[in-house]
From Swiss-Prot:
InterPro entries: aa-tRNA-synth_I_CS (IPR001412), aa-tRNA-synth_Ia (IPR002300), Anticodon_Ile_ABEc (IPR033709), Ile-tRNA-ligase (IPR002301), Ile-tRNA-ligase_type2 (IPR023586), M/V/L/I-tRNA-synth_anticd-bd (IPR013155), Rossmann-like_a/b/a_fold (IPR014729), tRNAsynth_Ia_anticodon-bd (IPR009080). Its EC number is 6.1.1.5. It catalyses: tRNA(Ile) + L-isoleucine + ATP = L-isoleucyl-tRNA(Ile) + AMP + diphosphate. This is Isoleucine--tRNA ligase. Its main location: cytoplasm. The gene is ileS. IleRS has two distinct active sites: one for aminoacylation and one for editing. The misactivated valine is translocated from the active site to the editing site, which sterically excludes the correctly activated isoleucine. The single editing site contains two valyl binding pockets, one specific for each substrate (Val-AMP or Val-tRNA(Ile)). It comes from the Archaea. ATP binds at K599. A motif ('KMSKS' region) lies at residues 596-600. It is an enzyme of class 6 (ligase). The keyword Aminoacyl-tRNA synthetase applies. It is found in: Cytoplasm.
C-alpha cells in the first residue's frame, strides 16, 4: 500500500534506495529478458579510453545513450547494448610510462616489453572497473557484465579479419610516406590525433644561390629552419608573375633576388634593402630552367649529389615570397610533388626526432626543433639569411604526450581508402544524420578529402598487425583469425598481444621462415571494427547476420573525423557498406562563458560534484534539457539548480495527495477515471498528459531530447504543480467519501502514473521511486519496475485541444486578474465581487467559469459579448491647432466649454451634428477638434491578456471584508499546523484574539468555515482573550493585530 513520503526531495536517499532495489531484484536483466523477442535495436557504444575518471563530456554522452535506450526498451525493442571500452594505444601507454617514470622507448625496451604490456593491461582493466562504477552511479544501464573490450582475443580477431579482407581486395600496401610523427612516442599518429594550439616559431627568409648566375638568389620563406638541410627543390605557381630584382643595401652593394612580383615590397622590407629595380618579369613556368645550390651543402654532404630545380605546383600561394621550399621527406604536399617529379625523398631525421648521419656531422644527433637556432646561424654565416624573426601560429602536437609533431618520411602500412572515397560518399547518403548537416556538410567534406589510412604504429600496447613476411623470399601473408594462426604455427597461441605473438614463426611456401612485422594497429582501427567485433564476428556469423549493421550510434562532433570516419572506412573495406543506420552527433561541454574546461583556468566541473550536490537525475535532466544535443553545452550551476528545483516541485506534486489517499484508504479499485463524472479540469489534465506523451514521441523520433525534456519540465511546473494541484486541492479536504474527491484522486493517480513512465528514460531514479510507492503501492500486480512498463503512449480520444486552448485562456485571465489586483492593492486572498472579461473574439469558457471564479477569488465572472466593454468614463482633450483657426478670438470660450461639460454630452453633440451651446453662443464642433479617451471607473482595474482585457472590481463590502479576514486567519492557522508538524487528520483547538471589535464581528460569521478548513474542534474569536496553547504567534493584517494560539485537541 502507499505510504507518505518525506516533505523534501532528498536525491541521495532516493537514488541509493533505487540502486539497492535494482541490484537486489536484478532489474536490468529482467528488463532485457522481458524485451527479448521484440523488434531488434542494435546500439554500438563508442568506447571511451580507460585512462582515468569520467568527465562531464563523457557523462553527457552516456546519459544521452542511456535515455534513448531506456526509451526504446519501453517501446518494446530488444536491445543489443554492450558497453564498450577502448583499452589499447598511446592513451594507455603514456599513462603507464608516466607511472613508471619512463621518457622514451628505450626505457620500455630496458624494462621489458612483456612486463610493460602487463602493466598496460592491468592499468586498462583497473580503470575500466572504476569508470564502470562512475557510469553506473549516473543510472546508466548498459550490458556492463559483458562489455566488448579491445584487448580481448575475440575482439583482436575482428581487426585481423578486416585487415585480411583489405589484403584480399588489394587495398593493403606498404610504402614510404610522410606522416605526422611524435618524436617522444616515436610513432606515426593520425590527422585526427593532432591537437593544435598557438606557438611561437622562427620565421625566416632564405636565399638559395642560382647556379650559373652570379650574385643571384631564389628567395623562400619557412617556419621550420630544421628542414633546410633536407631541401631538394623549390616550387612556383605557373600562373603567378615573378621578377628578378636588383636590390641595394645601405652600403651600396646589391643582390639579384627572384620572388613573386606582387610580394617584392614586403620581402625587401623584411631584408631592409633601401632600393630596388625590376630587371625582368616572367611567369612561373619560365623559371623551370633554373637550378640552385642548397646553402648548407658544405655541412650536409648528401646535398652535393642532388640537383636542385624549380618545379610547378598548384599549392603555391601568393604569400611571403610566392616560392615554396620543398623537402619531400618532411611535408605532405612536398612528398606528393616529390613522387610526381621523381625527386629524392631525403629524410635525414630518425624516429626520435634527431638528425641522422645523413644530415652531416655538425647536425647529427641533435633534436631537430632544438637545432633551429643553429641552422639559422649557419645560414647567416653563409650569407643565405635574408631576414629572420618570430611568428605565432597554430602548430600541431601529439594528442597524448603534447609533444610538437614533425613530418618525416617512414615506411608504413596503408589501406587505400582514397580508392573507396566515391563509394563512401554514396553510403553516407543512406545514413540518417542528426542533425542533417552533420552528414551532408561536415562529414561529407571530411570524406571528400580522405587520404589513404596509415594503420601502422611503432608501439607496443595495441593490436599487432597480423602480417608475416618471409625472410627468404619476401612473401607476405595476412592472418585473419587465431585459429588460422594456430593452424599455420602448429601450436596454440593464448595471447594475441606483443610480445607473445612476435615469437610466432610461420613456414613460407618457399621453405623459409616468416616473421611478424613489429608494428601494431593505429588505435582508431580498434574501435573502427566495433560494430562487428561486439557481435563476436568472425567467430559468430549468425549473430552478425541477425543484428548488423547498427541501428544507432552517437558521439561528439569531433568523431566526424574520428570514430564515425574510421568505422565507415573499415566497414567499406570489409563489407562495402556503412556500419550504422543513424548517427546522432552531440556537442562538447564548455563552461558558462563558452570556454573549454581546463585545470589551468580552474573551470572544470566534475560530474560527481554535480551528483553530490543535486543528484544524478538532476545532472541527467539538466544536460539533456539545456540545449539541442548537437550544440555545445555551456554548463551552468544555476541551470542545474533550476532543474533540481523542478524535481523538488515534482516531488511535492507527487507527495501532495498521499496523506489524503492514505487517510481515505484509496485503492486501485477506485482509480478508474471512467467511473466518475470528471470535472472539466480533470479532463483537461488528462488531455495535457496525453498531449505530452505525443510531443515526447515526436521529439524522440528525431533524437531531440532537449525538446522532450523541456516539454516534461513545462508540464510539471506549469500544468501540474502551478495549476491542476491548486485546482484540485480543496477537493481532497472533503471529509466524506465523495465521488468528486475520488474523481480527483483517480485523476491524480492516472496522471502521475503516466508521468513517471514518461520521465523514466530521463530521470530513472526518481521515476522508479515514485512508481514503487504510488503505482506498485496501489497495484501490486503492476510490473515490478517502471522500466519494465510499456511506454504509455497517448490516446487521441483523450486529447481535447479545444479544452486545452480554453484552459490556456483561463490561466491567462487568472494571471491578468492577479496583475490587476496588484495594481489595485487587493491581495488574492481577499475576494472581489466580480471580474469582467472583454474580448473581440468569442471565448468559449462556459465549462470553466467555476475555475475562473476560484482562481481569481471572485464572486462573479462576466464575459461580455465580442467587441463590448464595461461602461467606461470618458476623458476629453482639445486639439488647439484645430480650434484656433476656426474660432479665432472665441477659441478661449470654446475650450472652456469643452473642458467644463460632461465628455459624454460633448460626444453626443458631435455625433448628432448639433451645435454646442455656451454662454448664449452656438459653436459647431467637429470630430478632429477633440480627442476622447475611455477610462474605466476607479473601482475597475484593467489588465491585458492575449485575447483582450480583464477588469477586476476592487470595491469592498462588509461581506467581502469578512471573508478576506477569515481567509487571512485560516492561512495563519495552517502555517502553525505545519510548525507543529500535525498530521492531516489531527484536530486542534484554536483561539484568535483581534484588536478590532469591528473585525471580530465580521469574522464571527465565518466561524464554522474557519473551523472546517483548519480542523478545529474549538474556535474562540474575540478581542480580549486569555490565550493558551502549544504555539502562539502574533500577526498583523491591514493594521489589525491578530494573536493566534493553537493546541492539539
Amino acid at each position: 500500500m502507499i505510504v507518505e513520503v518525506p516533505g523534501q526531495y532528498n536525491p541521495k536517499n532516493v537514488e541509493d534506495e533505487v540502486r539497492e532495489f535494482w541490484h537486489r531484484e536484478d532489474t536490468y536483466h529482467k528488463v532485457r529478458r522481458l524485451r527479448s523477442g521484440g523488434r531488434r535495436f542494435f546500439f554500438v557504444d563508442g568506447p571511451p579510453y580507460t585512462t582515468g575518471r569520467i568527465h562531464l563530456g563523457t557523462a553527457w554522452n552516456k546519459v544521452i545513450k542511456d535515455s534513448i535506450l531506456r526509451y526504446m526498451s519501453m517501446r518494446g525493442y530488444d536491445l543489443k547494448d554492450r558497453a564498450g571500452w577502448d583499452m589499447h594505444g598511446l592513451p594507455i601507454e603514456v599513462k603507464v610510462e608516466e607511472h613508471l617514470g619512463f621518457r622514451s622507448k628505450r626505457d620500455i625496451e630496458s624494462y621489458g616489453v612483456d612486463r610493460f604490456i602487463e602493466q598496460c593491461k592491468s592499468f586498462a582493466l583497473r580503470q575500466k572497473d572504476e569508470m564502470t562504477e562512475q557510469f553506473k552511479s549516473l543510472g546508466v544501464w548498459l550490458d556492463w557484465d559483458n562489455p566488448y573490450m579491445t584487448l580481448k582475443n575475440e575482439y583482436i580477431e575482428a581487426a585481423w579479419w578486416t585487415l585480411k579482407r583489405a589484403h584480399e581486395r588489394g587495398l593493403l600496401e606498404r610504402g614510404l610516406r610522410v606522416v605526422n610523427w611524435c618524436p617522444r612516442c616515436q610513432t606515426a599518429i593520425a590527422d585526427s590525433e593532432v591537437e593544435y594550439w598557438d606557438e611561437s616559431d622562427p620565421s625566416i627568409y632564405v636565399k638559395f644561390p642560382v647556379e650559373g648566375e652570379d650574385n643571384t638568389y631564389i628567395v623562400i620563406w619557412t617556419t621550420t629552419p630544421w628542414t633546410i638541410p633536407a631541401n631538394v627543390a623549390v616550387a612556383v605557381h605557373k600562373d603567378f608573375m615573378y621578377s628578378k630584382v636588383r636590390a641595394w643595401r645601405r652600403d651600396g652593394t646589391y643582390e639579384i633576388l627572384i620572388m613573386a612580383t606582387d610580394l617584392i615590397e614586403n620581402v625587401l622590407k623584411q631584408g631592409r634593402y633601401v632600393d630596388y629595380e625590376i630587371l625582368e618579369s616572367m611567369r612561373g613556368e619560365d623559371l623551370l630552367s633554373l637550378t640552385y645550390k642548397n646553402p648548407l651543402q658544405d655541412l650536409v654532404p648528401a646535398q652535393r649529389d642532388i640537383v636542385h630545380r624549380v618545379h610547378l605546383a598548384d599549392f603555391v600561394t601568393a604569400e611571403n615570397t610566392g616560392i615554396v621550399h620543398i623537402a619531400p621527406g618532411h611535408g605532405l604536399e612536398d612528398y606528393e610533388l616529390g613522387l610526381e617529379k621523381r625527386l629524392p625523398i631525403f629524410c635525414p631525421v630518425g624516429e626520435d626526432g634527431r638528425y641522422t648521419s645523413e644530415a652531416g656531422k655538425k647536425y647529427e644527433g641533435k633534436y631537430v626543433r632544438d637545432a633551429n637556432p643553429e641552422v639559422v646561424e649557419d645560414l647567416m654565416e653563409r650569407g643565405a639569411l635574408l631576414a629572420s624573426g618570430e611568428l605565432v601560429h597554430r602548430y600541431g602536437h601529439c594528442w597524448r604526450c603534447k609533444t610538437p609533431i614533425i613530418f618525416i618520411a617512414t615506411r608504413q602500412w596503408f589501406i587505400g581508402i582514397s580508392e573507396l572515397r566515391d563509394q563512401m560518399l554514396k553510403e553516407i547518403e543512406r545514413v540518417s544524420w542528426y542533425p542533417d548537416w552533420a552528414g551532408s556538410a561536415r562529414f561529407k567534406d571530411w570524406i571528400s578529402n580522405a587520404r589513404d589510412w596509415c594503420i601502422s604504429r611503432q608501439r607496443y600496447w595495441g593490436i599487432p598487425l597480423p602480417i608475416w613476411i618471409c625472410r627468404s623470399c619476401g612473401a607476405m601473408d595476412v592472418i585473419g583469425t587465431a585459429a588460422e594462426l594456430e593452424a599455420r604455427a602448429g601450436r596454440p597461441v593464448e595471447d594475441l598481444h606483443r610480445p607473445a605473438v612476435d615469437d610466432v614463426r610461420l613456414r613460407c611456401s618457399c621453405g623459409g621462415a616468416m616473421e611478424r612485422v613489429p608494428d601494431v594497429f593505429d588505435v582508431w582501427f580498434d574501435s573502427a571494427v566495433a560494430s562487428w567485433a561486439t557481435l563476436n564476428f568472425p567467430r559468430d556469423e549468425e549473430e552478425f547476420r541477425v543484428w548488423w549493421p547498427a541501428d544507432f550510434i552517437t558521439e561528439g562532433h569531433d568523431q566526424t573525423r574520428g570514430w564515425f570516419y574510421s568505422q565507415l572506412g573499415a566497414s567499406m573495406v570489409a563489407f562495402g557498406r556503412a556500419p550504422y543506420k543513424s548517427v546522432l552527433m552531440h556537442g562538447f561541454t564548455l563552461d558558462e562563458q563558452g570556454r573549454k574546461m581546463s585545470k589551468s583556468i580552474g573551470n572544470v566541473v566534475h560530474p560527481e560534484d554535480v551528483v553530490e550536490r543535486y543528484g544524478a537525475d538532476t545532472l541527467r535532466f539538466y544536460v539533456l534539457s539545456s540545449n539541442a544535443p548537437w550544440e555545445d553545452l555551456h554548463f551552468s550551476w544555476e541551470g542545474a539548480m533550476n532543474v533540481n528545483r523542478m524535481l523538488n516541485i515534482l516531488w511535492n506534486a507527487y507527495r501532495f495527495p498521499l496523506p489524503y489517499m492514505v487517510l481515505d484508504r484509496f485503492d486501485i479499485s477506485k482509480a478508474d477515471t471512467s467511473k466518475y463524472d470528471l470535472r472539466p479540469e480533470d479532463r483537461w489534465i488528462i488531455s495535457r498528459v496525453n498531449s505530452l506523451a505525443k510531443e515526447i514521441e515526436e521529439n524522440m523520433s528525431g533524437y531531440m531530447l532537449h525538446r522532450a525534456t523541456r516539454s516534461l519540465q513545462e508540464f510539471v511546473l506549469e500544468d501540474l504543480s502551478r495549476w491542476y494541484i491548486q485546482l484540485v486541492r480543496p477537493r481532497t479536504w472533503i471529509e466524506t467519501e465523495d465521488p468528486d474527491k475520488l474523481a480527483a484522486y483517480a485523476t491524480l493517480y492516472n496522471v502521475m502514473s503516466t508521468l513517471v513512465k514518461l520521465m523514466a528514460p530521463f530521470t530513472p531514479f526518481l521515476a522508479e521511486s515514485i512508481y514503487q510507492n504510488l503505482v506498485r503501492g496501489l497495484d501490486p500486480s503492476a510490473p515490478e519496475s517502471v522500466h519494465m512498463c510499456d511506454w504509455p503512449g497517448y490516446r487521441e480520444d483523450l486529447i481535447d485541444k479545444g479544452l486545452e486552448e480554453s484552459m490556456s485562456y483561463v490561466r491567462e485571465i487568472s494571471e491578468a486578474a492577479a496583475n490587476a489586483r496588484q495594481k489595485g492593492g487587493r491581495k488574492l486572498r481577499w475576494p472581489v465581487s466580480r471580474i469582467i472579461i472583454a474580448s473581440d473574439e468569442q471565448l468559449d469558457l462556459r465549462d470553466l467559469l467555476h475555475v475562473l471564479r476560484t482562481q481569481t477569488n471572485s464572486k462573479e465572472v462576466i464575459i461580455l459579448p465580442p467587441g463590448e466593454k464595461p461602461e467606461m468614463n470618458l476623458e476629453i482633450s482639445v486639439v488647439q491647432k484645430k480650434i484656433g483657426p476656426v474660432f479665432k478670438g472665441e477659441s478661449r470660450d470654446v475650450v472652456e466649454a469643452l473642458t467644463s461639460m460632461n465628455p459624454k454630452e460633448v460626444k453626443r453633440i458631435i455625433e448628432s451634428g448639433e451645435p454646442l451651446e455656451w454662454k448664449g453662443r452656438s459653436y459647431m464642433i467637429t470630430e478632429e477638434m477633440v480627442e476622447f479617451r475611455e477610462i474605466p471607473p476607479a473601482n475597475l482595474i484593467p489588465a491585458e491578456f492575449s485575447k483582450g482585457t480583464v477588469y477586476v472590481d476592487v470595491s469592498l463590502t462588509d461581506e467581502l471584508r469578512a471573508e478576506g479576514y477569515a481567509r487571512e486567519i485560516i492561512r495563519r492557522i495552517q502555517d502553525m499546523r505545519k510548525d507543529l508538524d500535525l498530521k492531516v487528520d489531527e484536530m486542534i483547538r484554536v483561539s484568535v484574539a483581534l484588536n478590532s471589535n469591528e473585525v471580530v464581528d465580521l469574522v464571527s460569521g465565518w466561524r464554522d468555515y474557519i473551523s472546517s478548513e483548519v480542523r478545529a474542534t474549538l474556535l474562540r474569536i474575540g478581542n480580549d482573550l486569555d490565550l493558551e496553547g502549544e504555539l502562539t504567534k502574533d500577526w498583523e493584517v491591514d493594521g489589525v493585530k491578530i494573536r493566534v494560539s493553537v493546541a492539539r485537541a
